[in-house]
Swiss-Prot record:
GO terms for molecular function: ATP binding; magnesium ion binding; shikimate kinase activity. InterPro entries: P-loop_NTPase, Shikimate/glucono_kinase, Shikimate_kinase/TSH1, Shikimate_kinase_CS. It comes from Prochlorococcus marinus (strain MIT 9211). This is Shikimate kinase. Catalyzes the specific phosphorylation of the 3-hydroxyl group of shikimic acid using ATP as a cosubstrate. Disulfide bonds: none annotated. Binds 1 Mg(2+) ion per subunit. The keyword Transferase applies. Substrate binds at residues 48, 72, 94, 150. Belongs to the shikimate kinase family.
């Protein structure tokens, strides 16, 4: 089956369910999301971009003024609004999985964990000028601490894709292949509501 046929089959079987990309900072969710969305004829939303637009503040400014708890409250509100829509690929913030109430929304769609190799993730984060409030000071130790804390939660994802140096296009194809396998399983997403256009 060629890639186009695979994407068409997956899109049909998804029935309008949102795809939520989760993973650590620097894993490529925001780079892969638009590519995957285009291949599936889905819309694309980046949760952090929506938060910044709605609050008219950067993520760092929100952390400075509201702290992590305040930021997570805003993030949950935005996720709830996004969850009312369908046929979206959603790039989430790395910590969105840490709030149990978010999982109720995430599992209305399909949760895809992009698991980037640690050294490559750290290399990307070192060269990225985007302020990362939770990775201030000792990048390696803070990254490892966050990953250890989040790993059991990431493992609850519907799809787990380990990646290294692949292009966003290759990651999107890998996601689609995994989705195809998931959706073809009898137990794959039973009980999840599909949305008919």
């Amino acid at each position: 089956m060629d890639d186009l046929s695979r994407f068409n089959q997956v899109c049909k079987k998804l029935g309008g369910r949102n795809l939520y990309l989760v993973g650590m900072m620097g894993s490529g969710k925001s780079r892969t999301g638009p590519v995957l969305a285009k291949k599936l004829s889905y819309g694309f939303v980046d949760v952090d971009d929506v938060i910044e637009k709605v609050t008219n503040q950067s993520i760092s400014e929100i952390f400075d003024q509201e702290g992590e708890i305040g930021f997570r409250e805003i993030e949950t509100q935005i996720l709830q609004e996004i969850g009312q829509r369908h046929s979206l690929v959603v790039a989430t913030g790395g910590g969105i999985v840490t709030r149990p109430e978010n999982w109720g929304i995430l599992h209305q769609g399909v949760v895809i964990w992009i698991d980037l190799d640690r050294e490559i993730a750290l290399s990307r984060l070192r060269s990225d000028e985007t302020p990362r409030p939770l990775l201030q000071k000792n990048l390696d130790d803070n990254f490892d601490c966050l990953f250890k804390e989040r790993l059991p939660i990431y493992l609850e994802s519907d799809v787990h894709l380990s990646v290294r140096e692949e292009s966003p296009d290759d990651v999107a194809i890998g996601i689609c292949t995994n989705l195809q396998l998931l959706l073809l399983k009898d137990e794959g997403l039973d009980g999840r509501q599909t949305i008919e256009e």
